[in-house]
Amino acid sequence: MDLFEYQARDVFEKHGVPVLGGIVATTVDEARAAAETLTSGAGSVVVVKAQVKTGGRGKAGGVKLARSPEEAAEAAEQILGMDIKGHTVHRVMIAEGASIAEEYYFSVLLDRANRSYLAMASVEGGVEIEQLAVERPEALARVAVDPLVGIDAAKAAEIVAAAGFADDVAGAVADVIQKLWTVYDAEDATLVEVNPLVRTTDGRVIALDGKVTLDDNAEFRHPEHAELEDAASADPLEAKAKAHDLNYVKLDGEVGIIGNGAGLVMSTLDVVAYAGERHGGVKPANFLDIGGGASAAVMAAGLDVILGDPQVKSVFVNVFGGITACDEVARGIVQALEILGDKENKPLVVRLDGNAVEEGRAILAEANHPLVTLAETMDGGADAAAAAAHSAVTA
């Protein structure tokens, strides 16, 4: 479960990680009141930050400085309802401003390849860390973390030294790193990331932004996470998917993906990403696994979720029939399109194979829906869906 920034901030504060004051607002009036609470006089600055589970908020206009409660209200009015990479902004966080001297980066995450944990740190924070890792990999220190030991004082000192932190800030950063490890360990997280971790002009080291992903498999140990999950599912698409017990993850691309089985869906994401490189750089818009034995109703529900995403420009349905029969999938597609009627105009590329494939193809052929195209292979279907999305984006 990915947390919103304001939720990550609250979890940080719970475990002693230094953070600035922040208040969540869902209306303009609430934003104004929050700014009044956080500003202490002339010259006080707050930051109005869109709460969405995607990057690029600043570039999209989702982060604005405000020097008065009225400016905060105006910023909130502009940000609330904004679409950022397909994510609608339903709430903002009004955060205290800070006078920043330096920006750093730190994260700890599950390292599946090595069956361990990995800490990453850099003295160059506040940038796209993926870009930094590619262009200047030496600027990003990577330190393995023993799951049985964690990040104690010695390991924190090793991380700080590997990243090249200056002596005058190394101790404070190491202390914050240990507290961030406590968040990771105590909350059963798979990712804790701070970008930027900052040193202010008065010498404090503060987590200015935060990203936390909690392990859903550890929910039984954390009944308190239920409240976080309810708020984290406030996105209408995620809430709709959850209501139908669909395994859905929103991504930032333009090609909607539906498949049966996590392995097939992951493979489909890869194939669509490769196809997108040939068609203007379009990418997968989501992960959606309808599971084994899915009925026509489940297929229709999944299609309804994906077609409701304004970021999606085309859909690729890739099903290998086993327990899930291809004729049930075909009926679900026809059913969903009948319900949506003229409201929907996004092209669907469908690749069926396996159990009842001929029956499924016959159902779609008989329906003869103008939006549906049948593909013989996964590669061919991915290419057609990527091409359709690119055409829609450039139209």
Curated annotation (Swiss-Prot):
Show the InterPro entries listed in the entry: ATP-grasp (IPR011761), ATP-grasp_succ-CoA_synth-type (IPR013650), ATP_grasp_subdomain_1 (IPR013815), Succ-CoA_synthase_bsu_CS (IPR017866), SUCC_ACL_C (IPR005811), Succ_CoA_ligase-like_bsu (IPR005809), Succinyl-CoA_synth-like (IPR016102)
Highest taxon, organism lineage = Bacteria
What EC number(s) is this enzyme filed under? 6.2.1.5
Give, as in the UniProt entry, the pathway in which the protein acts.
Carbohydrate metabolism; tricarboxylic acid cycle; succinate from succinyl-CoA (ligase route): step 1/1
Q: What is this protein called?
A: Succinate--CoA ligase [ADP-forming] subunit beta
Q: How is the cofactor bound?
A: Binds 1 Mg(2+) ion per subunit.
Q: Which HAMAP family match?
A: Succ_CoA_beta (MF_00558)
Q: Does Nucleotide-binding appear among the keywords?
A: yes
Q: Name one GO molecular function term.
A: magnesium ion binding
| Gene that this sequence comes from | sucC
Binding site residues for ATP = K49, G56, R57, G58, A98, E103
